[in-house]
Amino acid sequence: YGMSSFDKNNVLRVFNLIMRNDDLVVHKEFDNFETHAEGQTRVDFDFYENESMEDVIDIDPSLELKGRNDYIDWGKPVPKGTPLKIIVDRDKSGTVKVFAECCGAKGEFVIVSPGCDRV
């Protein structure tokens, strides 16, 4: 599982948070994400399911987990480069939770893979 973000060359890419070969139960913390624009007041999250073993990949729209409206909004403009904290947990049932925090605002997003309800 990954989420979209801008790389150091200002290109929107997918940054993988959970890799295919990770253990089933996962807890990871990331502090290398930041706001992209000067005066930003929120961050939108687009999640992707893929089998790549690369940390960063090009966006493939067919892999986006559609129908989501995930964001955190802190309501006041912040400088470009303001840190975002991302925490990812996957439990033994396979449920993935992403926690995000910036400027005191927090969000929790549950990712369910398409087709999991038929397993």
Regions found by a protein language model. Name each.
Residues 1-119:
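Acidic low-complexity intrinsically disordered segments
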